[in-house]
């Protein structure tokens, strides 16, 4: 799988628009200002949080956690539980937003991987059943994330 990616690395990298790199760099450089509404607007657009139609209360809780992550390490499972406690919609619906949680952790430590549907599909992983308990879903996703951390380090170390 990686052999094919390495073979076509130029083509793969050429699909990344320069604006995506400069916006990522700006977000990383200005992370200490994550409580600023202007920063949050750019962050939400970059990480496609607006498409998820998250309610303002969830976004407030999210950026509070992003701010907290700058002074202490937050495990993914704890972050997922904390964010789950805040409804994601105005109607009070809660949902497990592990992708956004992984992006939050990545912002604080860019050596941490990002988990989203594209990554999940690349590795042929399957989402946990919504019939599983919250703890069961978090444990399944945490196992995926641990695998990604190990895989990320393996790729960086061994190409």
Question: Where are the model-predicted features located?
Answer:
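An N-terminal alpha-helical hairpin/helix-loop-helix interaction module that forms a charged
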Residues: 1-93, 109-159
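Short, locally clustered residues in the helix-turn-helix/winged-helix DNA-binding domain
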Residues: 106
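Cytochrome P450 catalytic-core helices
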Residues: 103
């Amino acid at each position: 799988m990686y052999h094919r990616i390495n073979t076509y690395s130029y083509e793969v990298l050429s699909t990344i628009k320069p604006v995506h790199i400069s916006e990522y760099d700006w977000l990383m450089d200005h992370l200490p200002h994550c409580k600023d509404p202007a920063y949050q607007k750019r962050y939400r657009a970059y990480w496609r949080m607006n498409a998820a139609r998250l309610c303002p209360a969830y976004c407030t809780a999210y950026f509070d956690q992003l701010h907290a992550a700058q002074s202490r390490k937050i495990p993914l499972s704890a972050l997922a539980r904390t964010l789950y406690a805040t409804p994601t919609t105005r109607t009070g619906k809660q949902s497990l937003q592990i992708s956004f949680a992984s992006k939050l952790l990545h912002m604080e430590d860019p050596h941490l991987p990002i988990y989203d549907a594209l990554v999940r599909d690349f590795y042929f992983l399957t989402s946990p059943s919504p019939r599983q308990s919250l703890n069961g879903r978090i444990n399944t996703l945490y196992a995926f994330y641990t695998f990604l951390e190990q895989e990320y380090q393996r790729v960086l170390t061994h190409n």
